[in-house]
């Protein structure tokens, strides 16, 4: 079945084909047309498209980032040149089976496929978000419940350029690692902060004492009654050393037995 997508532009309209409308998703294609000339401007094949009707119609420009409903066609200015571009869904190929898009930038000669912008809509979690006021594009990617990365980009020479990223990593609970990277005008500068959450539900018991001479705390703790760990924190509460560094569910170097 083929549906027309309209109402998002005075210049353009879209068409989308679903091979099977009895399913929530199916393969198909998405096309963009010039309203005056009826010329087909963009065609994108998709291995999977979401079939969401609103009052019997398909709507454009719905983007519930990162995992909510997404239209198969988005029409927005992505490179901040004052001209609206197109994001066309080509499946659910982003992280955790999230929607993925191909990006076509407006030019003097029509719409041109952008590999660099498309990667931002393929390799992360869903479609990227756009802050028009500050001219920033943002992406998010994750691995399970305990690792997330948030990145910001500006646009230079019609290409996205990474200017900052923030990563939080709690995969080795109760050790938490925060990593920030910022562009200083010449290079990316990385800052890493490591802390310990003694209130973690995984810590069954801990013992802490202070060493005045070096102004540091020594912490011994037990995770899930499996192993004895220790950590050294400085006067700012940052972890300078912890041992062992492996997950508590890997083979321990030594055991703690009451």
Give names to the regions the model predicted.
Residues 48-60, 229-257:
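A low-complexity, Ser/Thr/Gly/Pro-enriched, surface-exposed linker/loop concept
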Residues 2-5, 67-78, 123-136:
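Beta-propeller blade termini
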Residues 12-14, 199-245:
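N-terminal secretory signal peptides
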Residues 81:
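Acidic carboxylate motifs that coordinate Ca2+ or other divalent cations, activating on Asp/Glu
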Residues 26-28, 95-102, 145-152, 226-230:
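Structural motif
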Residues 33-36, 96-116, 150-157:
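Beta-propeller blade repeat segments, especially FG-GAP/WD-type strand-to-loop junctions
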Residues 1-40, 130-204:
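Acidic, small-residue rich beta-repeat scaffolds with periodic aromatic anchors
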Residues 86-90:
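Hydrophobic beta-strand segments that make up the repeating blades of beta-propeller
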């Amino acid at each position: 079945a083929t549906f027309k997508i309209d109402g998002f532009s005075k210049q353009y309209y879209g068409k989308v084909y679903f091979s099977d409308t009895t399913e929530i998703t199916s393969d198909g294609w998405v096309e963009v047309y010039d309203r005056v000339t009826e010329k087909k401007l963009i065609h994108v094949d998709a291995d999977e498209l979401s079939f969401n009707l609103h009052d019997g119609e398909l709507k454009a420009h719905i983007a519930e980032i990162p995992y909510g409903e997404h239209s198969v066609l988005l029409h927005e200015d992505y490179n901040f040149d004052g001209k609206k571009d197109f994001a066309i869904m080509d499946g659910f190929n982003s992280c955790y089976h999230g929607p993925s898009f191909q990006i076509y930038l407006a030019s003097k000669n029509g719409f041109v496929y952008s590999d660099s912008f498309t990667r931002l809509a393929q390799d992360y979690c869903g479609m990227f978000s756009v802050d028009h006021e500050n001219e920033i594009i943002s992406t998010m990617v994750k691995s399970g419940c305990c690792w997330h990365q948030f990145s910001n980009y500006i646009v230079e020479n019609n290409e996205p350029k990474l200017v900052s990223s923030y990563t939080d990593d709690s995969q080795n609970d109760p050790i938490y690692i925060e990593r920030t990277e910022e562009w200083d005008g010449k290079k990316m500068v990385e800052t890493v902060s490591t802390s310990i959450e003694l209130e973690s539900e995984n810590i069954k018991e801990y013992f802490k004492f202070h060493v005045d001479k070096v102004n540091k705390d020594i912490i011994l703790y037990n995770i899930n009654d499996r192993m004895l760990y220790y950590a050294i924190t400085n006067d700012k509460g940052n972890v300078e050393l912890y041992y062992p560094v492996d997950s508590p569910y890997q083979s321990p170097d030594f055991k703690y037995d009451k």
